[in-house]
């Protein structure tokens, strides 16, 4: 039995030795990490004793020399950095609060590694440079160029709504007509200038700014009050123009109605006179016919008509013996 046990133990020992060797090798692989992985959208930079020996931007699994080669990975995708809101005076010395955001990417990974090395350093440097560029560009341009991108507000023909050319607008209350300033560049053009100014300073860092976007522009309290007052003034002018146009339309329609009224009254008067003439002619014919048949009755009838017209307005006391009343008291 003892001899058989020694034989089994002799066969197990080589297996254990092999397992130990394999375990040591696997542990060495894990500890030394001779492999590195480049994912899509990444750039790898390999250094040896601090010196750059190569770069690689192709996705895949690669081998390096442990302890000798160090792998630094960076993204090739767009990154974003938000600037700090800052109060800046425009060319007119009107203070506004400007807040921007920017998109950037690593253009030259070697320059980036040698000059900055980390994202934290890159964010800090980019933010400082862009904030400085924003200040430089804003201070030499007018407020209208900062807040507007086109002259569309000037080119729009408001007279289409009012049937009155804008150049002929007049206001009864002496209000001054406000005009929008014509911009020379516009906000989008200023954003491109800021990007270009920032790129001129960042080219030595292997960084390129893709674009700068104005997230927000806030007026100071004084400027905001001035803008609101101008808006109210413009709205009042448009309202006054509406009223003036309405009054003009009203006068035009009243004139037409008055002319139509006069025309209708004239036609009605002519028709009434015609009918009256016909009636008088017929009455005269009837009177003539009646007179021919009974002159005495005709005289009596005409006297009654005279009494009816004259007596109600007579305030004097008249005698019944007068010739005037012969038809009343003689019969």
Swiss-Prot record:
Subcellular location as annotated? Membrane
Q: What are the UniProt keywords, alphabetically?
A: Membrane, Transmembrane, Transmembrane helix
Q: Which is one Pfam family of this protein? A: Band_7
Which Gene3D superfamilies does the record match to this protein? Band 7 domain
Q: What is its main location?
A: membrane
Q: How does it sit in the membrane?
A: Single-pass membrane protein
Domain of life of the organism in this record? Answer: Bacteria
Is Cytoplasm there in the keyword field? no
InterPro entries in the cross-refs: Band_7, Band_7/SPFH_dom_sf, HflC
Gene Ontology annotations for the cellular component aspect, listed alphabetically: membrane
Q: Which residues cross the membrane?
A: 18-38
Keyword Hydrolase belongs to the record:
no
NCBIfam families (UniProt xref)? hflC
Q: What does this protein do?
A: HflC and HflK could regulate a protease.
Q: How does it assemble?
A: HflC and HflK may interact to form a multimeric complex.
PANTHER family with a match to the protein in the record: MODULATOR OF FTSH PROTEASE HFLC (PTHR42911:SF1)
Please state what the protein is called.
Protein HflC
Organism (species)? Treponema pallidum (strain Nichols)
**What is the name of the gene encoding this protein?**
hflC
């Amino acid at each position: 039995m003892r001899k058989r046990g020694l034989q089994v133990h002799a066969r197990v020992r080589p297996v254990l030795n092999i397992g130990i060797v394999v375990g040591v090798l696997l542990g060495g692989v894990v500890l030394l990490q001779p492999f590195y992985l480049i994912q899509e959208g990444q750039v790898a930079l390999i250094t040896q004793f601090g010196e750059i020996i190569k770069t690689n931007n192709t996705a895949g699994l690669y081998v390096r020399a442990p302890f000798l080669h160090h792998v630094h990975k960076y993204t090739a995708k767009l990154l974003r950095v938000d600037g700090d809101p800052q109060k800046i005076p425009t060319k007119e010395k009107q203070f506004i609060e400007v807040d921007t955001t920017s998109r950037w990417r690593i253009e030259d990974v070697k320059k980036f590694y040698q000059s900055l090395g980390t994202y934290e350093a890159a964010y800090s440097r980019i933010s400082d440079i862009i904030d400085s560029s924003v200040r430089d560009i804003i201070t030499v341009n007018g407020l209208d160029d900062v807040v507007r991108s086109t002259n569309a507000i000037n080119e729009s023909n408001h007279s289409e709504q009012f049937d009155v050319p804008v150049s002929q607008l007049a206001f009864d209350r002496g209000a001054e007509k406000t005009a929008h300033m014509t911009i020379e560049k516009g906000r989008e053009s200023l954003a491109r200038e800021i990007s270009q100014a920032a790129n001129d300073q960042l080219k030595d860092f292997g960084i390129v700014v893709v674009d700068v976007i104005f997230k927000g522009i806030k007026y100071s309290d004084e400027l905001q009050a001035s803008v609101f007052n101008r808006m109210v003034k413009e709205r009042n002018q448009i309202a006054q123009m509406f009223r003036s146009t309405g009054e003009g339309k009203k006068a035009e329609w009243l004139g037409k109605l008055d002319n139509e009224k006069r025309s209708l009254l004239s036609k009605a008067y002519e028709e009434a006179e015609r009918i009256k003439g016909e009636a008088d002619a017929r009455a005269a014919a009837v009177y003539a016919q009646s007179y021919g048949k009974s002159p005495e009755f005709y005289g009596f009838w005409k006297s009654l008509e005279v009494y009816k017209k004259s007596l109600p307005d007579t305030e004097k006391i008249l005698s019944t013996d007068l010739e005037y009343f012969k038809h009343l008291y003689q019969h």
